[in-house]
C-alpha cells in the first residue's frame, strides 16, 4: 500500500510538470517535442512496468487497492497522449489558419494569384524545379515537422506500444482536423496553393505514419477516404485551370492507379 501511495504521488507531480511543459513552445512548424517531455512519459511507462513488482506478491495482487494504481497509471498515460497530441495538432491548426488566407473572397487570394502562377508539377516533380522556390513551402515545413517529431518519439520513448498508441491518435486527430477544415469550405474551390500544400500534407502524413506501423484500418479510415475524394476533385480542378486538364502525374489518382500516396 505504501509503495502504491508513493507511485501515485510521484506520478501526480510528473503529470503537473508535463502539463506545464506542454504550455511552452509556440505553434510553428519549428516546434520539436522537448527531451523533458519524453523523460516524463518514460517515468509513467516505467512506473506501469514496476507497479506489479512493487504492489504485488509473487505476481498476484494482494489487495484491490494495488490494482487501482494500475488503473491510475493507465489513465495518466492516456491523458499524456491526449495532451501531447493536442499540442501537436495546434501546429497543424496554425498551418491551416495560414492556408485559410487564400480562401476565395479573401483579400489575399487575388494578390497571390497575381504574384505567382503555381504549377502543380513542381510539387509532383520537385527535381525539375530545384532552382526555383518551392510552390508548397508551408506544406513542406509541416511534413518536416512531422518527420522530426516522429523520430524524437522513436529515439526518446521506451515503450513501442505506447508510441504506436500515440501515433494512431495523432494520425486520427490530424485527419479529423483536415476534414473539418475542408468541410468548412464545401462551397469553395481550393486555391492552387491550398491544394498543393494540403495535398502534400495529406499524402506524406499517410506515408509517414504507414512507415511507423500504423494499422491500415486507422490509415484508411472513413475520414481519410472523405479527404482523399475531396482532394481528387480539387486536384482535377487545379489541373483543368492551369494545364488545360491534360497530362501530369496526380497526387491523388483514381483507386487502383495509386502507387504510393
Q: Whereabouts are the PLM-identified features?
A:
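Extended alpha-helical "rod" scaffolds
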Residues: 3-261
Amino acid at each position: 500500500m505504501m509503495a502504491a501511495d508513493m507511485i501515485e504521488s510521484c506520478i501526480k507531480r510528473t503529470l503537473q510538470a508535463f502539463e506545464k511543459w506542454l504550455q511552452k513552445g509556440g505553434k510553428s512548424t519549428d516546434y520539436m517535442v522537448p527531451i523533458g517531455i519524453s523523460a516524463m512519459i518514460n517515468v509513467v511507462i516505467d512506473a506501469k512496468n514496476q507497479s506489479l513488482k512493487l504492489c504485488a506478491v509473487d505476481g498476484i495482487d494482494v489487495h484491490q487497492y494495488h490494482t487501482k494504481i494500475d488503473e491510475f497509471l493507465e489513465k495518466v498515460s492516456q491523458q499524456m497522449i491526449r495532451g501531447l497530441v493536442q499540442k501537436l495538432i495546434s501546429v497543424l491548426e496554425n498551418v491551416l489558419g495560414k492556408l485559410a488566407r487564400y480562401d476565395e473572397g479573401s483579400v489575399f487570394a487575388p494578390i497571390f494569384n497575381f504574384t505567382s502562377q503555381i504549377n502543380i508539377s513542381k510539387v509532383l516533380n520537385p527535381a525539375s524545379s530545384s532552382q526555383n522556390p518551392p510552390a508548397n513551402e508551408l506544406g513542406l515545413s509541416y511534413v518536416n515537422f512531422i518527420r522530426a517529431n516522429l523520430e524524437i518519439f522513436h529515439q526518446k520513448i521506451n515503450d513501442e506500444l505506447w508510441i504506436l498508441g500515440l501515433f494512431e491518435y495523432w494520425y486520427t486527430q490530424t485527419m479529423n482536423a483536415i476534414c473539418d477544415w475542408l468541410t468548412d469550405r464545401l462551397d469553395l474551390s481550393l486555391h492552387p496553393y491550398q491544394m498543393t500544400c494540403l495535398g502534400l500534407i495529406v499524402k506524406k502524413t499517410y506515408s509517414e505514419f504507414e512507415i511507423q506501423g500504423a494499422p491500415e484500418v486507422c490509415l484508411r479510415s472513413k475520414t481519410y477516404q472523405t479527404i482523399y475524394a475531396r482532394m481528387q476533385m480539387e486536384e482535377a480542378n487545379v489541373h483543368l485551370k492551369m494545364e488545360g486538364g491534360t497530362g501530369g502525374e496526380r497526387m491523388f489518382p483514381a483507386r487502383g492507379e495509386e502507387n504510393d500516396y
